[in-house]
Amino acid sequence: TAETEMNCLRQCILDTKKNAYAHHIQRLMILGNFALIAGLDTAQVNEWFLIVYADAYEWVELPNVSGMILFADGGYLASKPYAAGGSYINKMSDYCKNCNYKVSKKQGKDACPFNYLYWDFLARNRNKLESNHRISMMYKIYERMGEDKKKAIAYDSKHFLKAIYD
């Protein structure tokens, strides 16, 4: 619907609605990244991508969405999940300039949701992902975080995601 305070998501969804198209990076690193780190349902995300894009063919879209975007195949197609925080989006686009959230903030109600959802995704999927050498450094960084920060990440993520479904 594009009814979100997150400028990057809003713009990508509006462009998709208008053109039935989005650049690969918009699909992978904004829409797909959000679906991945927010823990959205694989079947529903696959269906959405197939419905909204004029160039979506099942033989291409399903492996790309399930394997590359959502890492739902456990790493057969992609060697690591394409997950990132707000800093990546800020470096690769100009969406953050006009966003209601602050990409520089890591927690709290004004923080970019990509920032805390990224760490929450890693925490939720630790058993599956920690042994992946391509992201093991991120788990070392997570381990060095204080317990208060980890609790704030979990709290912000829980409340943000709850608001989506309410």
Q: Where do the model's predicted regions map?
A:
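C-terminal catalytic domain of photolyase/cryptochrome flavoproteins
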Residues: 1-166
